[in-house]
């Protein structure tokens, strides 16, 4: 402890980092208390919030603060070299995948508690595979987990608000109309729920822990890094081909309701439901689609509309002269 105090006294950067940690966890604690009314929307939620959710979130903030400061105090003067991935890291990645599944369903799925356990395991497995692919491309367990946590929180907001505003679940095909969505998004009123606040706080805590964790990599030398990316690309391609060509969804009992994707998401989980529906809704134009023909039809329709308006204006002018 004396060494830690001496380091803070002599090093301005260390004092700034310590102040940032205090501010970081202080803001999360204040946010939790300010968002307390959002956790008590109904009588049942209020009872659950008072006796479980709010105390657990507060305890998580306190515990993460203690762990974070202990890590900060025990940090060596020199940055430790990255280690190779061992058997412990996949276990942590699997635990993180389970957490990502739980937070995504907590925000977006009103039937989360009714989901069958083997569908929950299937969702965790899919997220775990995605985590492995990302970690291979980034050559870093820590950076991959930080990316996955932030990405899944953002996707939970996308799934929640798209369904709230449109009444239909977000699908892969919606990426075609992302520009239109960006134009109209300002006209909607965004309301934050208790689930979103809870997910945000836990995400920030988990990201903080991953930021202070030891760096583990698959390769160190440049040649090995290049080979790793090539292998990751080949593995990704193989995973995609298996995903598109194998009847995995039927084998696991996942029935895609293409007319009501939200039902599929709620029943089988958002991750599995999204991938199952996306399998039959590719980002490819339908048969016979021609951009030039669509443009020509639109131009013709616009000209006909202008002609009809001109005729109507002439008729109104003639009628006015007659009167």
Feature annotation, model-predicted:
Residues 246-323:
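Soluble catalytic regions of membrane-associated enzymes that act on cell-envelope
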Residues 2-265:
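Transmembrane and membrane-interface helices of multi-pass
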């Amino acid at each position: 402890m004396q060494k830690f105090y001496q380091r803070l006294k002599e090093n301005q950067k260390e004092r700034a980092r310590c102040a940032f940690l205090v501010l970081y966890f202080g803001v999360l604690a204040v946010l939790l208390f300010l968002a307390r009314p959002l956790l008590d929307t109904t009588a049942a939620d209020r009872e659950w919030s008072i006796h479980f959710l709010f105390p657990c979130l507060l305890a998580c903030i306190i515990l993460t603060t203690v762990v974070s400061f202990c890590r900060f105090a025990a940090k060596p003067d020199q940055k430790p070299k990255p280690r190779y991935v061992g058997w412990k890291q996949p276990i942590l990645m699997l635990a993180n995948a389970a957490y990502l599944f739980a937070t995504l369903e907590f925000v977006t799925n009103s039937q989360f508690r009714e989901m069958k356990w083997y569908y929950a395991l299937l969702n965790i497995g899919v997220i775990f595979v995605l985590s492995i692919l990302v970690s291979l491309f980034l050559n870093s367990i820590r950076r991959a987990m930080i990316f996955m946590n932030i990405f899944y929180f953002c996707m939970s907001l996308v799934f929640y608000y798209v369904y709230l505003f449109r009444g239909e679940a977000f699908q892969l095909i919606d990426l075609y109309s992302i520009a239109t969505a960006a134009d109209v998004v300002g006209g909607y009123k965004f309301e934050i729920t208790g689930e979103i606040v809870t997910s945000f706080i836990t995400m920030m805590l988990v990201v903080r822990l991953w930021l202070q964790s030891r760096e583990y990599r698959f390769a160190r030398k440049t040649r090995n890094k290049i080979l790793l990316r090539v292998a990751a690309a080949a593995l990704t391609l193989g995973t995609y081909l298996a995903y598109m060509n194998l009847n995995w969804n039927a084998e696991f009992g996942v029935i895609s309701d293409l007319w009501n994707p939200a039902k599929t998401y709620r029943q089988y989980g958002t991750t599995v439901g999204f991938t199952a529906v996306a399998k039959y809704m590719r980002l490819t134009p339908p048969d016979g689609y021609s951009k030039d023909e669509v443009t020509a039809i639109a131009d013709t329709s616009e000209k006909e509309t202008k002609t009809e308006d001109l005729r109507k204006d002439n008729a109104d002018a003639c009628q006015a002269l007659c009167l």
